């Protein structure tokens, strides 16, 4: 699990050719890693949707990332339920 800082740190990241200053309790390395993943996702989606403007591309990226997150949350709930069911069977 990643280590969180006690104080907010600012760092500059690059996403799709734009520089952004972000602040958070996570390390600058972690924030840059997150930004790099967003950048990669935007570039991946650009290949499939070459005519989207940057704003629409960013929204499409956000929708895709949220979809991934929701599916992972659902899978975690499923695994937790399986673990609980397994614990009941072993009791």
From Swiss-Prot:
Coiled coil ranges: 62-82
Keyword annotations from UniProtKB, A to Z: Cell cycle, Cell division, Coiled coil, Cytoplasm, Septation
Compartmental location: Cytoplasm
GO cellular component: cell division site; cell septum; cytosol
Source species, domain of life: Bacteria
InterPro entries in the cross-refs: Bac_CellDiv_Activator, Cell_div_ZapA-like, Cell_div_ZapA-like_sf
Biological processes, Gene Ontology terms: division septum assembly; FtsZ-dependent cytokinesis; septin ring assembly
Family, as annotated: Belongs to the ZapA family. Type 2 subfamily.
Complexes and interactors: Homodimer. Interacts with FtsZ.
UniProt function note: Activator of cell division through the inhibition of FtsZ GTPase activity, therefore promoting FtsZ assembly into bundles of protofilaments necessary for the formation of the division Z ring. It is recruited early at mid-cell but it is not essential for cell division.
Name of the protein: Cell division protein ZapA
Organism: Halalkalibacterium halodurans (strain ATCC BAA-125 / DSM 18197 / FERM 7344 / JCM 9153 / C-125)
The gene coding this protein: zapA
